[in-house]
Amino acid sequence: PGATARYGSYLSPGVIMMPSYVNIGAWVGPGTMVDTWATVGSCAQIGANVHLAGGVGIGGVLEPANAVPVVIEDGAFIGSRCMVVEGARVGKGSVLGAGTILNPSIPVIDAETGEEISRGYVPDYCVAVGASRKREFNGGEFYLPCVLVIRRMSEGERHDKVALNNILRDHGVAT
């Protein structure tokens, strides 16, 4: 009740929609949960068995024709109030901690090495959280957003909710 899927969107069998919104051209895979107040933008591609937690914003694209949509791969969990926008991608089985912002220009950094893994792409089976890193400009030092991969998981580990909660809590991330 209270959910809207616009004409021209596609919801696979078994999709669960709480009061939420799926826009035209979006594709939502089987067994996916679109939780309360989550929004799936135009042409976004959401895989199978994904959980979009409360208030998640998945960006959309309608134009230009060569714009890159958001892709959330199978089995991912997108935490409450995350924003994933045009051209960003979340890999299979990955977890974004609550409030994470991901776009194509935001660096994704490995917490163990400090190395930049990619921009706008969280690899498969990673636990990632929003963070910031110091940058120097003529006007001073400022902290710019980044996404920090705090753990890489095996495929089976992703579905152990107790282990996942412990990983997040060990790093001070709300679950």
What name fits each language-model region?
Residues P1, D124-Y125, G130-T175:
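Terminal amphipathic alpha-helical/low-complexity segments used for targeting or macromolecular assembly
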Residues P1-E136:
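Structural signal for interior beta-strand "rungs" in well-ordered beta-sheet cores
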